[in-house]
Amino acid sequence: MTCRIAIRKYSFILCLAVGSVTIYTSEVIGTPLYFVNKELYNKYIAFTKSFAGILFTALVQLFSPTPVTLTYDPELRNLFYLDRNGCLETIAAERNIVIANHQLYSDWMYVWWLSYTAKQHGHVYIMLKNSLKWLPVIGWGMQLFRFIFLSRKWDKDYETMSRHFKFIRNVRDSVSLILFPEGTNLVESTYQRSRVYADKIGVKMPKHLMLPRVRGLFYSISQLRDSMTYLYDYTFYFSDPSPKKYAADAFSLPKLFFEGVPIKRLHIHVRRFPISEIPTEEDQFTDWLYQRWYEKDKLIDTLLETGNFPGPKKLHTTVRLKHRLEILSLFSVLFTCIVAGLFLKLFISH
């Protein structure tokens, strides 16, 4: 390990640790609200959840600067724009479901950044694998955020999802449910496993993607249909200066955040589908979802041929905070508690 990599590595770990401990402590401080007013407690947790969206956006900005080109279907032309500083601004439905193809372990950070551009970063609910819930501090915090941890055992996941969806239906605030239907990131072994399954059920295998898993998304939509407006579909493609066949081989978490391996460009194409128009029968939904994935595959074909996804306009930006001082908001709860404690101490002493 070179000196440069060592400095980057321990700087990243320090920033992540300080930020995570601060956010988790802020969550715990608000616990008494749960026993006083649950709606107020949920709003408080959303407030602390926004800190996490800011933290992870800042970590990408600082340790893995990522140029982004965003395109969208023509009917969405008025929902995306750049502010005077070149930061992306997004107008999203107040209650929505977000799906995306899964290329990297860090994909969820980019989806959270997109939620940040829509001012919904405090209202995301992400589906993650069950093992992550036990990560010290980070996992505990995500449990308080009510993220949905899945074991890939349907009987158990069915109960977990049902419990969380009951909560989400009753939330009076914004909601953005985020999931990756492919279930894992794209590498040679997962692609071949998906190919075997495609051959088994007799469907066409995409060239650049894995087949999406149907059951979880179908159940999510069926349970939330009456409380959600739109489903947003993000197609991600990470340009690799190498290039390697699979982005995950080039851009592992250590390579991105410790070694500083640069992502040449992240291409994102956004589509939107009214929840009310998505099929309600599982067989029809399966066909519908596979068709969306074949369309995503063609979008990537177009990008590889022309250098860009199709769209009426291309927005060029970077993953970053709108204002660097936003990172200080992470400490707002602790600062308030410290100041209040000092005033209380002075009051008692006099």
Curated annotation (Swiss-Prot):
This is Uncharacterized acyltransferase C428.14. Belongs to the 1-acyl-sn-glycerol-3-phosphate acyltransferase family. GO terms for molecular function: acylglycerol O-acyltransferase activity; acyltransferase activity. InterPro entries: Acyltransf_C (IPR032098), Plipid/glycerol_acylTrfase (IPR002123). One of its GO terms (cellular component) is endoplasmic reticulum membrane. It is found in: Endoplasmic reticulum membrane. It comes from Schizosaccharomyces pombe (strain 972 / ATCC 24843). It is a multi-pass membrane protein. The chain crosses the membrane at residues 10-30, 51-71, 327-347. It comes from the Eukaryota. Its EC number is 2.3.-.-. GO terms for biological process: phosphatidylinositol acyl-chain remodeling; phospholipid biosynthetic process. Keywords: Acyltransferase, Endoplasmic reticulum, Membrane, Transferase, Transmembrane, Transmembrane helix.
